[in-house]
Amino acid sequence: MKRFLLACILITLASPSWATKIPSGSKYDSRIQYVDYNSGDVVLVRALPGVGARIVFAPGENIEDVASGFTQGWEFKASHNILYLKARSMTLSHSNQSIDMAPEPGKWDTNLMVTTDQRMYDFDLRLMPGRNNQRVAYRVQFRYPAAAAAAAVAAAQKRVVQARMNARPSPVNWNYTMQVGTNSASIAPTLAYDDGRFTYLRFPNNRDFPAAFLVAEDKSESIVNSHIDPSAPDILVLHRVAKQMVLRLGNKVIGIYNESFNPDGVPARDGTTVPGVKRVIKSPGENLQ
């Protein structure tokens, strides 16, 4: 007896497990149904004779291929991310006679396989009896909790990176002096510092920003790219750290001198001087994560 029970248990454990995923009905109407996507699930779709149904996939997803084990008895029409389906009559030829067969519950059940440009789906199609059967589906709509969670994580990471990029950097050098040219005090900055990568100049409110020029050892000048700090519109950010720069606006001129100039600047160990942000170079076509 014990051997028999053990054999039954082993057979049960070795048997395949079939568990069709049944969509849940809307609280407003049970015929509007929802199901979470899982690539390992087979989803049950219950239909009625003479009544169409539709399966709705993710927005932006496009159906590429539809296959079924009983295409003679079912009609399928794909439109972007929606698949319309309906059981249909079929005609059989026997002894030179044509016999029309209407869809019949229990005999029209089959499987359905859908391939989109993003995922693969498997279904059991079941034709149900009774016109008022509340278990049938007019619409089966997929939800994607894993994709939504991944998108939320990616969005949160993007916000963190953007916040770090927008954050005001920590100054590493305040040791700046300046020489004010004749009648040039109106374009003189009130504050100067650098973070080892960029130079930051603060100006009184409502003043025009001067153009900045890098002064080379041979005293030649070249323009320096700059932008206004979005979090502090009175600060002009120069995209260089240099020993000497010149500010010009019309005939006005200011000399800016970095008295603690470090030609090596701040080492960018992660490809960027922004704390917590790492620069990653990927090959063409490689997805960014």
Curated annotation (Swiss-Prot):
The protein's name in its UniProt record: Type IV secretion system protein virB9
Signal peptide residues on this chain, from the entry's feature table: 1-19
General remark: Transcription of the operon is maximal in early exponential phase.
Induction context: Specifically induced within macrophages by phagosome acidification. Induced at 37 degrees Celsius in minimal medium, suggesting that nutritional stress is a regulating signal.
TM region positions: none
CDD domains: VirB9_CagX_TrbG
Homology family: Belongs to the TrbG/VirB9 family.
Species this protein is from: Brucella suis biovar 1 (strain 1330)
Keyword DNA damage attached: no
